[in-house]
């Protein structure tokens, strides 16, 4: 019995690291593709951006661990779009918003962590000519995402500007 308890305790930290597993695999498989643009902003970049930000934005940036973006124009790499939607429809993600009006279809999916557990926001922007996947990972909640939009940090698709 003690051995099983020890094994369980040793495997418990792996449960937290598996949270981003699906998107990590997706990002790594397409980041090096020649016809996919990739951007990755790490924790150090968040620290640099925080220095010049107003206090509210600085507080939000403090919780962000990484921002990763993949963008591809038509014709997309084989399965790129389908696999992105498959990651978003993972049982851990919850759809929090979808817009299908003028411009690209934009969907937001969210996994909310608790305490020091990482949360993740995934945005899929499905336009006529371009498909964009944005992933924000860190310690934040839905209210923090709402504050970002109140600070005017929105996607061009969300505010109707090209």
Q: Model regions: which residues?
A:
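Sec-dependent N-terminal signal peptides
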Residues: 4-14
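Early exported N-terminus immediately downstream of N-terminal targeting peptides
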Residues: 20-80
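Extracytoplasmic
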Residues: 33-36, 42, 62-64, 90, ...
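Surface-exposed flexible segments
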Residues: 77-91, 134-136, 145
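Short Gly/Thr-rich strand-loop-strand
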Residues: 85-113, 158-162
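A short, solvent-exposed beta-edge/loop patch
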Residues: 109-142
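C-terminal partner/receptor-binding element of secreted or periplasmic proteins
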Residues: 131, 135-162
